[in-house]
């Protein structure tokens, strides 16, 4: 928010001139009641004691200094025990249009990242089956977060961690092998925990078509081949599904590579040297209790097999070796118990808490005709991301996945997101952009010329409360995106777009744009709509959703 940044700079300068430091508890926020002004500041209350002046008296001094320092301020009122309610002039808000025009598709971008290197790891589903809609929510979240961080000045790398080691992968190979035996008429026994989906049979049939002698191989060799083929086949499908969903990973990192290259053992030695790993009962343990975890954790079992935790520590060691200042992991909510031990591991690697964060993604309930669709990868009962994208489109799926906070459960109504109505949030926001484009096209058809660049005088006709409210909303975009980046909370973008779309639709219904009383007002209103459309387009781009020009 340009207004917030401008007011913050003015108040900080005034406080500094008083010989005081700017306190962390100072806030500048829009008041709940718009009649109180554009921004409310509690600074007089917070520094009153240090200044040795009663809050209201101090507020009066600050108000006078503000009026003198910033001609864009229309009024400063003192409320309650000493709050400052600041109102900016209409001219100030009208200048928002000029700022949007100057920035174009970079409007809303900030420099809060200051070029720091960030890595966002997301999806990272075991390559044991197709992606389901829960993975889709994590994919949309991770991709949007990466876009938001880049827009905020971070140097971002996106990454998928391929869990190609461990028991689940051995079970995948066994499952395909047994299906190959079944299809060949050979005797076989299916364990209870094998993967049952039709895709397992399809992979087995594909392998047999290429190599009918597969089932004549020794069992261990046959299972190894089944594992390699199945994993590659499933990963190819995952990559294609993500590409169709407009999700890009720059790095695909293999867990197996950590084991083969000795990275896990290297990490063990590092922990031992720090006194954080110890042998007990034939197993290797990580002393995580000294780092805030509720109990110590096994790294290598007594039979010599590695735990997932062991590979994960080595993987994060590798991340920091690559120079990332910020590492963000996006996990399913069922991994919440894993967070403390991972934080302990990062601390053991010598990293500060602010260099690592985990975003937990809650479950998605897929609804069709009011009925919830059950999902289970191992049982082969699930609605795949591929099926959902094919049915409703990437735009609708991405927006819906990003329409709630990641830690909130999400009901994904397949019928709702296909509706061309204002009840459909995807349609609601996209139609706001399409509506702006339609008005601009009609203006062109009537030979109404909107200059590529306007001056402040041309915007003077924007005097209606609805117009100033729209300008305030557009001005808020940079602050909103900064909050989304700093809080690792991309839902701020979709929430903001819903608010802007609502204000735009309301304005369009109430105010004649092309039928205004004079040409000057028409041009000013068209410029306002163009600025709103640019803000909506920029926000949709951050969500990875198209901004259609017609619907």
From Swiss-Prot:
Protein's name according to its UniProt entry: Arginine--tRNA ligase
Keyword annotations from UniProtKB, A to Z: Aminoacyl-tRNA synthetase, ATP-binding, Cytoplasm, Ligase, Nucleotide-binding, Protein biosynthesis
Reaction catalysed by this enzyme: tRNA(Arg) + L-arginine + ATP = L-arginyl-tRNA(Arg) + AMP + diphosphate
Subunit structure: Monomer.
Domain of life: Bacteria
Pfam families associated with the record: Arg_tRNA_synt_N, DALR_1, tRNA-synt_1d
Magnesium keyword on record: no
GO CC aspect terms: cytoplasm
Molecular function GO labels: arginine-tRNA ligase activity; ATP binding
InterPro entries cross-referenced by the UniProt entry: aa-tRNA-synth_I_CS (IPR001412), Arg-tRNA-ligase (IPR001278), Arg-tRNA-synth_N (IPR005148), Arg-tRNA-synth_N_sf (IPR036695), ArgRS_core (IPR035684), DALR_anticod-bd (IPR008909), Rossmann-like_a/b/a_fold (IPR014729), tRNAsynth_Ia_anticodon-bd (IPR009080)
Origin species: Nitratidesulfovibrio vulgaris (strain DSM 19637 / Miyazaki F)
EC number(s) given by UniProt: 6.1.1.19
SMART domains: Arg_tRNA_synt_N, DALR_1
Family: Belongs to the class-I aminoacyl-tRNA synthetase family.
Major subcellular location class: cytoplasm
